[in-house]
Regions:
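Intrinsically disordered and other compositionally biased segments
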Residues: 7-8, 22
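Bacterial N-terminal signal peptides
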Residues: 8-15
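Extracytoplasmic cell-surface/polysaccharide-interacting catalytic and binding patches
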Residues: 18-97, 101-195
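Bacterial N-terminal signal peptides that target proteins for export
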Residues: 1-7
Length: 195
């Protein structure tokens, strides 16, 4: 009886492991060529080649330590998107990415003066401790003069794991999904980061 239970337990563990490893074979992974910035699809088991860099298999979370530059994986995702946009005769570029906490404080203070209250300013400039710019996980694209390229990124950004997040900021993008996933619905403004 005991041998039967051990054997059944072994079969159960083996079948679970087999399912997990098989499922990993089907999880797509976007790999960007370091020279051309073009993408190739692999999977999380095979990974990327030495001449490539992974765009990641998930959203890019905040670092545990406050960074001093734009998140490297976010930059890879943007460069891949930029190369694809160029193939479609569109130009996209980062106007603002990583900001120091001090810079975000200054921008927020200026917005409070401009809009007359913290609540109103927060709709346009996230408070320093809420904003994703000081964490290197947000970019502003083509602002203020070229919304067409940013529109291309809004339509195609999901392929690279980049999503527009605020209805009132056509220029603001964040890596909130894995490349290829569907972007979440837009929220009205930056105050929704506070909720």
């Amino acid at each position: 009886m005991r041998k039967t239970r051990v054997f059944v337990a072994f079969l159960l563990v083996f079948s679970i492991f087999n399912e997990v490893s098989h499922a990993s074979d089907t999880i797509p992974l976007q790999c960007m060529n370091k020279k051309t910035y073009f993408l190739r699809v692999s999977n999380v088991i095979k990974g990327c080649e030495k001449s490539e860099v992974s765009l990641g298999a998930g959203a890019i979370p905040r670092s545990l330590v406050r960074p001093t530059e734009l998140d490297k994986q976010l930059m890879y995702r943007f460069k891949a998107a930029q190369a694809a946009a160029k193939k479609d005769s569109q130009i996209i570029y980062i106007v603002s990415g990583y900001r120091t906490l001090s810079r975000q404080k200054t921008l927020f203070a200026n917005a409070v003066r401009k809009y007359g209250s913290v609540a109103e300013a927060s709709k346009w400039v996230a408070p320093p401790l809420i904003s994703h710019h000081p964490w290197g996980t947000a970019i502003d694209v083509n602002y203020p003069d070229e919304p067409v390229g940013a529109g291309w990124l809004e339509v195609n950004g999901y392929k690279f794991g980049l999503c527009r997040v605020f209805e009132n900021e056509w220029w603001h993008f964040e890596p909130v999904i894995a490349p290829g996933w569907k972007c979440p619905a837009l929220v009205p403004d930056a105050t929704y980061s506070l909720n």
